[in-house]
Amino acid sequence: MSYQVEVCIDNIESLHNALEGGATRIELCSSLALGGLTPSYGFMTLAAKLSTVPVYAMIRPRQGDFLYSDDEFAIIQQDILSAQQAGLQGVVFGLLTADGDIDVARTRVLIELAHSLQLGVTFHRAFDQCRDPFAALEQIIDLGCERILTSGLAASAPLGKEMLTQLVAHSQSRLAIMAGAGVSPVNVADLALTTGVKELHLSGKSTRPSKMTFIASGSKMGAADQDDFIIPITHTATIRNTVLALKSIS
C-alpha cells in the first residue's frame, strides 16, 4: 500500500484492534481525551513486544500548551530514553516558544538525542499552533524530523485541505506531511487525493461498556460528566475501512 495509516491509541485493547484493522504504524499515548500524553513505560514495553508495525511514543509531559519549563524539558529527555529502552521505533513531540515559533534550540537537542538512540521523530500538532507555518516547516525539515502531523492549522484535516496541499507542495518530499484530526473512512480518500498526503493519522475512536458486574454509583474518578464505566477504544472496522478506502485509490 502506498499510504501509511497511523493509529493513535491509549490502551492495550486498542493496540490489538488497530493492528487487526491494518494500521501500518502506531502512535502510543495516554489520555487521548487530553490530546495525548506520554504513555507509561509498562505500556511502551508491552506494545513493543506485541506490535507487528512500528510504534512511536507520544512524548508530552502534560496537557495544555507546548511551552515547557526546564523541569518539563528534562522529563521529555528522560521519556525519550525510556522509549528507546522499551524497544520502540520512534517518538513524537513538539516544542514552541512563547511567541508561537518552533523552539529550535531545544528541539535540536531532542532530535539529536532521538537519532543517537536510533529513534525516528515526528513533530506533532504543536505545528498547528505556529504563527508562520511555512517558516516552521523549513525549520523542522532542517532539524531532521521524518514527518509533521498536522490538520493544516484547522479544527480538522478536512477543513485544512488547502493548507495541507500547500504544505505538501512546499515540503517537496523532504519530509512527510501526515494529515490528522477528523480523518475517517468517509473522507480519507478525498483528503489524500486532494492534498497529496501519503500518511494519514486517526484514532478510530469508539467505546465499549465496562465488564464490571457491580457498578458503583456514588463515586467519580474524574469529571462529573465522565462515565467511569465506558471504556474508549479504537474501533477495528473504522481502521479497516480507512485502509480499504486508501487501497481503492492506490
UniProtKB/Swiss-Prot annotation:
The species this protein belongs to is: Vibrio vulnificus (strain YJ016)
Gene Ontology CC: cytoplasm
A Pfam family cross-referenced in the UniProt record is: CutC
Quote the protein name from its UniProt record. Answer: PF03932 family protein CutC
Alphabetically sorted, this entry's keywords are: Cytoplasm
The family annotation for this protein states:
Belongs to the CutC family.
- Cytoplasm as UniProt keyword: yes
Would you say which domain of life the source belongs to?
Bacteria
Q: Where in the cell is it found?
A: Cytoplasm
Q: Which gene encodes it?
A: cutC
Any one GO MF term held by the record is:
copper ion binding
